[in-house]
Every structure is written in structure tokens, then in C-alpha cells.
């Protein structure tokens, strides 16, 4: 394919971990960022952002979207061209809702698609460091990723149509580095077995929509117990969500966004309860009932 002068990519926000699936499972949601990359005739970088928290977007080479763009050109051993990047933000920054590494989809198209989809995926995972956000953002749906003998093995995780993701996005940030810092360097065998068993139960619960399995499955001993203290109001929001009928609540990615899963018949009540709980805790938050995005980056 020939080199093009401008490309636009729409990328869904993602939620990762889903409780016990630490660093290996994620789902694409119906909330989006849009990136337009236009090749400049001369060297240089122009970054313009609109939408949610646009004023906080870096407009120099420290911008993570630009860094992902440049990484692709480095990978194919070509100098990155001058580029204008227009960002339409629908997914707030630093909230545990996705990865800027997905910008390499646009970079690949702008370069004439020198990389296959599998190569783009592998490079995005390498940039991000783990697959749980990148994979569903690129492919859509709920995805599980694990390393195989010859690279990443990625499988689709069936998601029952009655399961609604309810997303609660607070107005404060939590850096991934801080969320990683509080994690222990070693875990007990009992905790490892606990998460393995509950991840299996989660996969079957998502497929069948069976409430008993989902209520039990949305537990974790590897990351959430250590990160909850970094999120003001966590306990109150969790209690409110479950009381309103949610199967359970988890931290989305590294946080601070919280995700509840609920049957479609309880989603509205869960959304209202989570909103009220955070409001009573003195924290402004946007709470939305969403759906699974099945297309990924387009």
C-alpha cells in the first residue's frame, strides 16, 4: 500500500484486569478517542487536542501518542516524518481506561502499512509492556492474551449480552507507576491459586451470564487489595454498587476508574448508586452504563 498523507483512527477505551485477570485480560468499551495524523511537508510536530481534559494533553515530543507514532518509524528503520496530530478525547487521561500505544495503528497506515496486524499488535504490546489494554483496543471485544512458543496467543472471551459494564470515572488521576509501586514483589502460593481459580470462574461467568459465578469471580488477591487505599471512596462505592444489584466491582486497569458488572435489569440502579456514593464522599465522578465495543480500532 502506498504512503498516504492523512489518516484518522477511532480507538475504544478499555478496561483491564477485570479483577483476577491481572495483566492478561481486558475489554473494549463504547467510549472513544479519535486521532487524526496528517503528514507535514517539513519536519516538525503540531499537536491539537479537543474534548475531555484537552488542556492537559502535552503538545511536544513527550506526548505518549507521538512517542508511539515515532516508535513505529524507529521499528521500520525510517525517520519519523513531520506530523500534525489532532486528538479528540472521549476517554479521560490517566484513569485506567486505555493505552496511547494504539496510536501505532495510525502510524502504520500513514507509513503505507509496512507491518501486518500481528506485527502491529506485538509492537504495541512491547511499547505498553503488557497486553491487557492494547489487545482489546486494537481488536475489540473482551480478550485474553498469554505468551506462547512463538509469540502472543490471543483469544476472544465470550461476553453475555445481559452483562452491562458500569464505569465510574473520578476527577482525579492515579499514575500507573504509583499503582505498580504499592504491589508486593512476591506472592504466596495460596494467593496465586486463588487468582487462577477465580479467573477461570470469571471466564465462564462472562460467557454464561451466570450471576452466582460472576459474584464469586470478581475477586482478586494480587493487585486490588493493595491499590484500594489509593482510591478515596472505594469502599463506599463498592458497597453501594453491590447493594444496588451489581455482581461486583473492580478497579479498571491501574485505577482510579472503577468498573461494576451488572445484569441489564440492574444497570441503571447501579449507575445511580455509584454516582451518589462518590458524591457523598466529596468526589466528582462521571458514571456511565456502557456496552462492549466489538470492532476495536477503526
Curated annotation (Swiss-Prot):
Entries under PROSITE patterns matching the protein: GHMP_KINASES_ATP
The EC number(s) this enzyme carries: 2.7.1.39
Domain of life: Bacteria
Intracellular or extracellular location(s): Cytoplasm
Pathway: Amino-acid biosynthesis; L-threonine biosynthesis; L-threonine from L-aspartate: step 4/5
InterPro entries: GHMP_kinase_C_dom (IPR013750), GHMP_kinase_C_sf (IPR036554), GHMP_kinase_N_dom (IPR006204), GHMP_knse_ATP-bd_CS (IPR006203), Homoserine_kinase (IPR000870), Ribosomal_Su5_D2-typ_SF (IPR020568), Ribsml_uS5_D2-typ_fold_subgr (IPR014721)
Statement: the UniProt record of this protein carries the keyword Amino-acid biosynthesis: yes
SUPFAM superfamilies per record: GHMP Kinase, C-terminal domain, Ribosomal protein S5 domain 2-like
First-listed, main subcellular location of the protein, grouped into a coarse class: cytoplasm
Record's catalysed reaction(s): L-homoserine + ATP = O-phospho-L-homoserine + ADP + H(+)
UniProt entry tagged with the keyword Amino-acid biosynthesis: yes
A Gene Ontology BP annotation from the UniProt entry: threonine biosynthetic process
One function term, GO molecular function aspect: ATP binding
Class of this enzyme: transferase
PANTHER family: HOMOSERINE KINASE, HOMOSERINE/4-DIPHOSPHOCYTIDYL-2-C-METHYL-D-ERYTHRITOL KINASE
Similarity comment text for this entry: Belongs to the GHMP kinase family. Homoserine kinase subfamily.
Name this polypeptide is given: Homoserine kinase
Protein's organism: Nostoc sp. (strain PCC 7120 / SAG 25.82 / UTEX 2576)
Amino acid at each position: 500500500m502506498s504512503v498516504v498523507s492523512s489518516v484518522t483512527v477511532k480507538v475504544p477505551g478499555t478496561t483491564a484486569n477485570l479483577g483476577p485477570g491481572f495483566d492478561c485480560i481486558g475489554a473494549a468499551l463504547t467510549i472513544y478517542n479519535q486521532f487524526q495524523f496528517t503528514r507535514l511537508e517539513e519536519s516538525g510536530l503540531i499537536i491539537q487536542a479537543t474534548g475531555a481534559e484537552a488542556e492537559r494533553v502535552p503538545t511536544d515530543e513527550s506526548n505518549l501518542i507521538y512517542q508511539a507514532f515515532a516508535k513505529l518509524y524507529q521499528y521500520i528503520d525510517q525517520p519519523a516524518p513531520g506530523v500534525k496530530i489532532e486528538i479528540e478525547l472521549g476517554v479521560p487521561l490517566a484513569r485506567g481506561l486505555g493505552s496511547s500505544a494504539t496510536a501505532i495503528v495510525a502510524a502504520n497506515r500513514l507509513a503505507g502499512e509496512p507491518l501486518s496486524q500481528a506485527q502491529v499488535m506485538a509492537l504495541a504490546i512491547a511499547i505498553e509492556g503488557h497486553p491487557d489494554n492494547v489487545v482489546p483496543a486494537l481488536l475489540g471485544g473482551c480478550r485474553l492474551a498469554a505468551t506462547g512458543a512463538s509469540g502472543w496467543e490471543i483469544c476472544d472471551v465470550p461476553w453475555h449480552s445481559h452483562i452491562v459494564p458500569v464505569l465510574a470515572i473520578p476527577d482525579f488521576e492515579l499514575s500507573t507507576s504509583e499503582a505498580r509501586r504499592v504491589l508486593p514483589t512476591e506472592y504466596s502460593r495460596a494467593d496465586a491459586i486463588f487468582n487462577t481459580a477465580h479467573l477461570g470462574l470469571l471466564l465462564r461467568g462472562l460467557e454464561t451470564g451466570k450471576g452466582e459465578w460472576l459474584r464469586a469471580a470478581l475477586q482478586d488477591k494480587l493487585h486490588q487489595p493493595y491499590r484500594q487505599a489509593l482510591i478515596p471512596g472505594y469502599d463506599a462505592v463498592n458497597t453501594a454498587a453491590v447493594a444496588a444489584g451489581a455482581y461486583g466491582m473492580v478497579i479498571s486497569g491501574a485505577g482510579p476508574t472503577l468498573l461494576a458488572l451488572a445484569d441489564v435489569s440492574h444497570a441503571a440502579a447501579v449507575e445511580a448508586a455509584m454516582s451518589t456514593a462518590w458524591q457523598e464522599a466529596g468526589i466528582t465522578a462521571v458514571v456511565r452504563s456502557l456496552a462492549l465495543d466489538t470492532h476495536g480500532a477503526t
